[in-house]
Amino acid sequence: MKSYKLVAWGQEGQYADSPKPIPGPADVLIRVKAVGLCRSDLDMMDSKPGSDPYASAIDANYILGHETSGVVEDLGSSVTDLFKGESVVVHHMRHCGFCNFCEAGVEQHCEYFKRGAIGMTRGCGFDGGLAEYLVVPRTELVSIGHEDPVLYAPLTDAGVTAYASCKDIFRNARPGQYVLVIGIGGLGSYAVQFLRLLTSARIIAADNSNERLTLAKELGADEAILSNASSKAEIDRITLNRGVDSVVDFVGSDATLQLAVSVVRPQGFVSVPGMQGGSVRLGWNLMATSAKFSLSLGSTRQDLREVCQLAKEGKLRIEVDRFSFDEIPRAYQMLRDGKLKGRAVIVMD
């Protein structure tokens, strides 16, 4: 079958002929319909041999693509709750199902599949969806019935990772509180939607692009500010010098992390799914007292079910830029150059 692989670290992906996978008794063979492309794919391609977080933890030579949707092509003998032709999405985080984390329902931290700071996933250490077919255990699938797989592909990482990074805020946000979302890209745009749908907090969006700030307002942000040296002063003005109760930083650079800790209130919460490798000093007089700081990793299958349900109810704005399988290099280049309007999605023939 045709596929697109990361053959070696520090190289662009390559088209390859790969064996068609065969499902075991507890597996499902998926005919891939759509695969979203992610900036982390570029990070893997750009990784130097032995470098963190990818090349130091896993081996190259796997099929890329961790935002995968498709239809059931064939079923293992013990899989009885799906039918051929049913639309499904893949929860890409690998998990054993038996370790303490899996039993606690936080399988993104699975001890068996954790390597350094990352969890091994479809398209990151294991073959992903940029191929005609993909075999996964039944436990890694969420059914979407007869929904369009193309629109659901970006929800399997961009959507659900944003959702998971905001879950503590969903539970704790109260009317009158402020939430700062830094970075209104593929993930941050979903975070604004989830926060608008599931909380009554006032949302401040921060980005260095006026175009993305306009999008944030369309998606439900109450305020939109440019990320620059004046960001803290602008947030102080908006909040009457109270600061914000929660921050979600989808960038993770030195500058954005410093902004986050400088504006969060006592007993506030900073969630950092962004992976730009920034650092920040924490300590007395450097961050508000009793504030919590969390590096957010991945999501759970239940998170994906909840996100898909919101999509089925028509509550999410899902924007995709469609490319054919033959256009994968061009799609990645447009992602690298920042020329996409929506999430790049490879639509299979």
Question: What does each model-identified segment do?
Answer:
Residues 269-271, 281-320:
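Rossmann-fold dehydrogenase core element
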Residues 85, 176, 221, 243-244, ...:
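Local beta-strand N-terminus motif with an aromatic residue
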Residues 258-262, 304-349:
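C-terminal hydrophobic helical "lid"/dimerization subdomain
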Residues 170-175, 198, 214-294:
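Glycine-rich cofactor phosphate-binding loops and adjacent beta1-alpha1 units
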Residues 139-141, 145-229:
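Mid-domain Rossmann-like dinucleotide-binding core that forms the NAD(H)/NADP(H) cofactor-binding site
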Residues 21-35, 50-103, 145-147:
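Glycine-rich beta-strand-centered segment in the early N-terminal region that forms part
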Residues 209, 276, 299:
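Residues in the short beta-alpha loop(s) of Rossmann-like NAD(P)-binding domains
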Residues 91-142:
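Cysteine-cluster motifs in flexible loop/terminal segments that predominantly coordinate metals
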